[in-house]
Amino acid sequence: MATTLNPSEISELIKTRIEQVKLSAESRNEGTVTSVSDGIVRIFGLADAMQGEMIELPNKTYALALNLERDSVGAVILGDYKHLREGDVAKTTGRILEVPVGKSLLGRVVNALGEPIDGKGTLGPTQTAPVERVAPGVIWRKSVDQPVQTGYKSVDAMIPIGRGQRELIIGDRQTGKTAMAIDTVISQKDTGIKCVYVAIGQKASTIANIVRKLEENDALDHTIVVAATASESAALQYISAYAGCTMGEYFMDRGEDALIIYDDLSKQAVAYRQISLLLKRPPGREAYPGDVFYLHSRLLERAARVSEEYVEKFTQGEVKGKTGSLTALPIIETQAGDVSAFVPTNVISITDGQIFLETDLFNAGIRPAVNAGISVSRVGGSAQTKIIKKLSGGIRISLAQYRELAAFAQFASDLDETTRKQLERGQRVTELMKQKQYTSMSVANQALSIYAVNEGYLDDIPVDKVLTFEEGLHAHFSNTQGALIDKINNSGDWDNNIEAAFKQHIEEFKTTGSW
């Protein structure tokens, strides 16, 4: 005979059964370290790991998951790994790598993970943001139409850079690439542009010297220095560029202008090649992995000028009517001037122009050693100030004609008057384009120098006196025309009154003969 249960007994029975159930959730977010070598850790059993996820190892050590294989995960360790052993427990965190961002990083030197390394204590209030982010889409971008003044006559006149542009600085070692980048940072002192300098694979002494120079020139207050020195692991050198980009994007997203320098992407590509080979990925051309183009394209595409709508949407209406920009100056080091190597050609094709620095020009004393013939800025022309755009057209033509004629003049015994004048003008333009390091030049002074050479005022000045003449001219101009200088620097306009003032001022100064 079947036992009958009343409702109260049934509910009691169910409660008892529930209490007896032992919940033993299958742990799929833990794995076991099977090998540790050369900064690479292999982990068995992390079935739920995601690409680029942070993996927690013993002693608060983290690794970045890069290879997701059928039964194991290959990850690069961020930091020291001497304490890790085979059999250690590894856990997924569900987070991708993030770094601190915010205004409290300005004036500080941090490592690739955003930790301060300058001995000035902890960072102030910060937020965190992921190091990898999709670049702004086409709809959110605006055309480049505002200038970034480098302070170099040769660059601002012939190869202008705009806010939101990617302009490559390329050349052999010891041709002044870093010097040009640092001078550009110093020139942003009073422009409101925040700067991020990412040092990849450089000597610690070199980085310390750069930081000291920025401090001496009052430029560190608007700059974040991200340092991944040559003594640090390949993983940190690889990540540092993305970390710096994230710090720069913080300002772009909030309707401000930022400038980022990657010094240099050749060393980042070498670090990534090292990681890829250790992870046993198949090598391609020059032993680089197949995705080395994507390595740089996804980084440089994050530099952009974004619209007012983008900024308003990102800040949820807090910032209105402001565009933001992130301008990138990547640096590439070539070997014996070979710009057709794998990484240089990749980055040339990604960027909006390039500044070629040549060893021969550098050794000849022409510094910055810019080769005006093959340097180009594809979008910067629309961002030039009116006055420089109006005056600089003749500079490139004069230099091009001079280089062409100089080659023939070596074989010609006697030259006609026109050719001789073009050669002499070219010599003076070449001399005028020389500039010492840490001597940034304002728009007004650049315009005055270019006007003087274009109108022939330097034709009777000896070539070796051109720079002395220019220095005296600027000093005289600042003493007598302070209001006009401020007007030109603020507006960048060009009109007949300014031309008349330039003409009168140069003629007055020439009569003094005080150079």
UniProtKB/Swiss-Prot annotation:
Reaction(s) the record says it catalyses = ATP + H2O + 4 H(+)(in) = ADP + phosphate + 5 H(+)(out)
The protein's topology relative to the membrane is: Peripheral membrane protein
UniProt-listed Enzyme Commission number(s): 7.1.2.2
Q: Name one GO cellular component term.
A: plasma membrane
Q: Which GO terms describe its molecular function?
A: ADP binding; ATP binding; proton-transporting ATP synthase activity, rotational mechanism
Quaternary structure and partners: F-type ATPases have 2 components, CF(1) - the catalytic core - and CF(0) - the membrane proton channel. CF(1) has five subunits: alpha(3), beta(3), gamma(1), delta(1), epsilon(1). CF(0) has three main subunits: a(1), b(2) and c(9-12). The alpha and beta chains form an alternating ring which encloses part of the gamma chain. CF(1) is attached to CF(0) by a central stalk formed by the gamma and epsilon chains, while a peripheral stalk is formed by the delta and b chains.
The record, for NCBIfam families, names: atpA, PRK13343.1
Known function: Produces ATP from ADP in the presence of a proton gradient across the membrane. The alpha chain is a regulatory subunit.
Q: What protein name does the entry list?
A: ATP synthase subunit alpha
Q: Which gene encodes it?
A: atpA
